[in-house]
Amino acid sequence: MAVQQNKKSPSKRGMHRSHDFLTSAPIAVEATTGEVHLRHHVSPNGYYRGRKVVKTKND
């Protein structure tokens, strides 16, 4: 079993854990409808970058 040779300082411990925390997903607002959606994804209304790309049930 591996055993460390020297104690890891609090600074180095923090640097090691720096990428462990979750980040929020990038959110975009559709210019046409004002709908909130994930970036590079179609909005719930079927719009992508100001154009209607998917037919929805309401159409």
Swiss-Prot record:
Pfam families according to UniProt: Ribosomal_L32p
Record region (Disordered): 1-24
Family: Belongs to the bacterial ribosomal protein bL32 family.
Name of the protein described by the UniProt record: Large ribosomal subunit protein bL32
GO cellular component: large ribosomal subunit
GO biological process: translation
Name of encoding gene: rpmF
Keyword line: Ribonucleoprotein, Ribosomal protein
Top-rank lineage group of the source organism: Bacteria
Keyword Lyase: no
HAMAP family the record matches: Ribosomal_bL32
Single GO molecular function: structural constituent of ribosome
